[in-house]
Amino acid sequence: MNTKQLHREWISIFEKEFSKKYFQKINSEVNNCSSNELLCPKKENIFKAFEKTNFTDLKIVILGQDPYHGNDQANGLAFAVSENQKTPPSLRNIFTEIKNDLNHHPQTKKNLEFWANQGVLLLNSSLTVKLGTANSHS
């Protein structure tokens, strides 16, 4: 896993975990995934939530279950998808609730990086899944 993407503050928070056996095992399994076991999101996006949201800027955590498991659907932020993807029902529901509750249509793209850059940590409880298999790494 590419932990170099993490903000410096997250690295100092997590660095003790990086040397523990459980983390090394997870890291080894992710790095050894063959093309037959593609991960969602792509390996370079596994820690994207910690890349886009700095710890000192953190305002709120929105927790999802696991990444979308469709091909090129998950981008590393919970509920977010790349702009070229169809809006999934869960994200559509979030946008609908914001509109209904605040009488305001969210001015953000489906990739939700605008929110992440403002201190919204969009984190899934499971950072990866196997392509095509929901809850496969729970």
Model feature map: region roles:
Residues 1-14:
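Generic N-terminal amphipathic, Lys/Arg-enriched alpha-helix
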Residues 16-138:
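A polyanion-binding, active-site-adjacent surface
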